[in-house]
Amino acid sequence: MAHTHCISGLVGKLVMESEVNCNADKYYKLYKHHEDLPSVIPHIYTSVKAVEGHGTTSGCVKEWGYILEGKPLSCKEKTTYNDETRTIHHMVVAGDLMNDYKKFDATLVVNPKSNGHGCIVKWTIDYEKMNEDSPVPFGYLACYQQITEDLSSHLCASD
């Protein structure tokens, strides 16, 4: 697991990369077809629904209920997909995150390992804090790490 941090004043980028022992396409598809996530990892996702567009089409808007550091939260985000590169980009447009951030984008990229066994899961958070008192979103990076591990365990168990 590798972490990278680039923080300058109110703007920052956090990156988390992790090797997992499951197929890249399966991992990407489970996250893209998001409806199952609350049943697979209910300790993180409490709900998800598409509120504009179809949930697996670029440009759709989804509402997520989730738990972060023991607190129930929600957000609305616009999602784009690139199936060729196994990339999902979430741009938060409303919800609890907007209390601390002017901008909060989370990007998931899933790449197969060169040896053909497993994949590399990379989460990148690009953010702009609302003000100096807003926290650096390390809690979200830890949450994405937990999601990565839990989805990998779920997929490995179902293989």
Swiss-Prot record:
Pfam families: Bet_v_1. It is found in: Vacuole; Cytoplasmic vesicle. One of its GO terms (biological process) is defense response. Its main location: other. Gene3D superfamilies: 3.30.530.20. Laticifer. Keywords: Cytoplasmic vesicle, Vacuole. GO terms for cellular component: cytoplasmic vesicle; vacuole. Belongs to the MLP family. Not known; MLPs constitute up to 50% of the soluble latex protein. This is Major latex protein 146. It comes from Papaver somniferum (Opium poppy).
